[in-house]
Swiss-Prot record:
GO terms for cellular component: cytosol. The active site is at 160 (proton donor), 375 (nucleophile). Belongs to the glycosyl hydrolase 1 family. GO terms for molecular function: 6-phospho-beta-galactosidase activity; beta-glucosidase activity. It comes from Staphylococcus aureus (strain COL). This is 6-phospho-beta-galactosidase. The gene is lacG. It is an enzyme of class 3 (hydrolase).
Amino acid sequence: MTKTLPEDFIFGGATAAYQAEGATNTDGKGRVAWDTYLEENYWYTAEPASDFYDRYPVDLELSEKFGVNGIRISIAWSRIFPNGYGEVNPKGVEYYHKLFAECHKRHVEPFVTLHHFDTPEVLHKDGDFLNRKTIDYFVDYAEYCFKEFPEVKYWTTFNEIGPIGDGQYLVGKFPPGIKYDFEKVFQSHHNMMVAHARAVKLFKDGGYKGEIGVVHALPTKYPFDPSNPEDVRAAELEDIIHNKFILDATYLGKYSRETMEGVQHILSVNGGKLNITDEDYAILDAAKDLNDFLGINYYMSDWMRGYDGESEITHNATGDKGGSKYQLKGVGQREFDVDVPRTDWDWMIYPQGLYDQIMRVVKDYPNYHKIYITENGLGYKDEFIESEKTVHDDARIDYVRQHLNVIADAIIDGANVKGYFIWSLMDVFSWSNGYEKRYGLFYVDFETQERYPKKSAYWYKELAETKEIK
């Protein structure tokens, strides 16, 4: 039976400033930590990425043509405040006004994120969000944007607080490249959630028009053997690190007893102490019912086994399937040998995990109000067919179809899901994979910056027109 999606459903495409804009030092933009980190550690940089800074009219014209009626955009904090605070860069402000005007001209609603992995370098060097001064600077930046850009109706504070702490302090693949420091992971999560809560409260108290929420990456965690208590415990602890800790902060305004028990266990095994003040709890509590929506980024699920050794993570950055290892002291290890398809980057393709995660939010956090799936898509080594000027990305179509089907199921089962944003609108730069891993509806020739609609773009157009998942 063909499933359908609601008439008012957003069929969106997602981007991020650093991954799409290029122009990393153009028109007064300040440096971000990634600029230096990529120069020192990788064979690629974010220059020119997809040159969205100059080519956004092309991408938005394509969006309109192919039925994309929403776009996730992030503002580069360092384009507005090159140092993260202090002097405003007027050319950066002008750019975003022009970008948002073009969105509305093309009938593509902008959903705008304030922070997408790109803290200005000056603040990042000073501890990023581990330094509580950065919370203050972020809230000031948020307030400036709320006042300056009234044309924006949908705001999100942060993109993926979980993977920021994870990437910076656990896996070590984001600057500053620290590994296995659980104290920093949880402190980063917490401090960023305080920053989120303060910005949301400010938005509501200021009477700004529009809606505000946050985007969380929520990979579902399962025990490899549900009858083995060690595997069950490993899945619970891994879920606390990546999901439950930040969801509790968002919607409970505190951390549940089970969450804190898990955090204390992990810190007791690995060393470290979490600094949470009474004022922090008051801030979280004041904002817990004020989020207008939750953005869920979902790509994969993980299966966990009990584990009794030291932490060791091998990150698959090359797309050579089977190159991943992930085991954490006091937590557990991910089992990759499961009967589930996976991508070349060892990401488990499991649409049921998205359904389970949506329904978990509905059940455990009934004050969620509404959900957008703000990222979901398939990273692929796309093969461009020169004679046809396209990509036959049937695997991507199949991936998206499967995930939209479970979204339709979740809606039937009572979840208020209002839209879906494919990652990504066009091919963009990938943080730890460079330019090989492509996700877009539109193929980008990174040499010429020409755009070519893939087969998936035509499929998505029909989906947006008919609302039928075929």
